[in-house]
Amino acid sequence: MRTELVSESGDPDRANEDFASVALPASGRGGALVVLDGVTPPKDATGCRHSVHWFTARLGGALTELTVSLPDVPLADVLGRAIARTAEAHASTCDLSHPRTPQATVVLARWSAGAVEYLVLSDSALLVESPDGTVTARLDDRLARLPRSARATDAHIDARLRNKEGGFFTAAADPAVAARAVTGTLPREEVRALAALSDGAARWVERFGRGDWADCLALIREEGAGALVERVRELERTHRGRGKRHDDATVVYVEL
């Protein structure tokens, strides 16, 4: 088995709000990966005294533990338990009902001798390569399908779309959101490799159009996860457009 993990802040003067881990149980059977992309809030109040990176570290740590310690519990239930545990850690000091309470996108994958399970919530990506080289992107595209006019202001997004029916969902303080994730299970023999990408790394495909998902996974496999992040940084330096010029970028690659 080959595993590779790269996570880099979009700004060296700011904490990385992504989280990534790979867990290989002591039994030597199976494993799991976790990628979280913390949602950077506007500069006004969030109702929480904690930072986004505090939240992603807490949630990511809980997910890393629970995905391997509860191998028979479905990933959506694992996510719900991890959200509840994280919420409990700051419920007494923070307003968890605030729409901008710390939150994150989620990618989980867990493999055993017989199956590969996955979960995707919001706009990070999981690439699945089959033995014949076919690459399938497992995505939660609800945010991407919203018209740009509906995303014109943060206030409108928070009031009408964020963790709302007809909008999109992130992992914040409500465990019920876990049921909204895109989930599935594949036979282990149908999966050769996995690559989980935060949207800062997925920009190579989604924003800059330098290749498709198969090209992206081939780049990671042949040149390494760091090469993808480096290519994204080069493109960010030369392209200007909507959104953050530089974003935290995370890649976890696993060959089964």
Language-model-detected regions and their locations in the chain:
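PP2C/PPM-type serine/threonine phosphatase catalytic domain
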Residues: 1-256
